């Protein structure tokens, strides 16, 4: 068997109708969403299947929906391939919570309530319309970081997602982000694209949300991981509850170091990255980070049927 890692996507991978075909073949999908619905007090599966998209895209509803989707897919994997265990896991932003549930660190229902709260706190921290995020395409990290420093003028703007070489997301106060995006274009960026988000994630504007999240995290049971999980903030696999909590708090206002995460997996001998969750966002990034890594996205019946040919 090839050495493989599992990676879990973050916000932006959700779609109305996701996991519909998987649910018809694997009852564990509906069971997983029922557990999530019981924790939330509303029918999450109905929202995911029926929408509308603008409801599903509200961050405090997106986050539980994606977490439940990734955990449901992982549970199908465990049922179908009990012998295929990943070497390591990681999740992009919100996906880190999915990884921690699948590695046995967080209880699923605890995590569902936690990410709903995370979404609400993030939305409360920055009034809608006052923050922004832009994807900067085709400019090196240093030039982007410099553009953000130049654009600050007393406001918050910083590089927050190092997604792949030549794809970095910046976030902060709307005017400052727009200034930084313009400076990036001047410095030679191919494109600067505004992202359709209601919250500028992973920047200093999220510190108030992080402080409140920390209070709730103190009362959450943290177990020793059964599989290593590389965190977003330090690209490290922590095993102690205190360190895991601290990393989740810092994650809210710190950059997601995804490029380094995938590079570390490759250096450690991983040959295949299995994206466990809706969409194929991480699959696309993997190929740009380490060209010879194989990447598969597992989220429907057809992709599950192809898993073994990739790994065995």
Curated annotation (Swiss-Prot):
InterPro entries: Ac_transferase_dom_sf, Acyl_transferase_dom, Acyl_Trfase/lysoPLipase, Mal-CoA-ACP_Trans/PKS_FabD, Malonyl_CoA-ACP_transAc, Malonyl_CoA-ACP_transAc_FabD, Malonyl_transacylase_ACP-bd
MF terms (GO), sorted A to Z: [acyl-carrier-protein] S-malonyltransferase activity
The reaction(s) this protein catalyses: holo-[ACP] + malonyl-CoA = malonyl-[ACP] + CoA
Pathway(s) annotated for this protein in UniProt: Lipid metabolism; fatty acid biosynthesis
Presence of keyword Transferase: yes
Keyword annotations: Acyltransferase, Fatty acid biosynthesis, Fatty acid metabolism, Lipid biosynthesis, Lipid metabolism, Transferase
E.C. designation(s): 2.3.1.39
Pfam family, one: Acyl_transf_1
Positions of the catalytic residues: 93, 202
Any one of the GO BP annotations: fatty acid biosynthetic process
SMART domains: PKS_AT
GO CC list: cytosol
PANTHER family reported for this sequence: MALONYL-COA-ACYL CARRIER PROTEIN TRANSACYLASE, MITOCHONDRIAL
Family: Belongs to the FabD family.
Name of the featured protein: Malonyl CoA-acyl carrier protein transacylase
Organism name: Haemophilus influenzae (strain ATCC 51907 / DSM 11121 / KW20 / Rd)
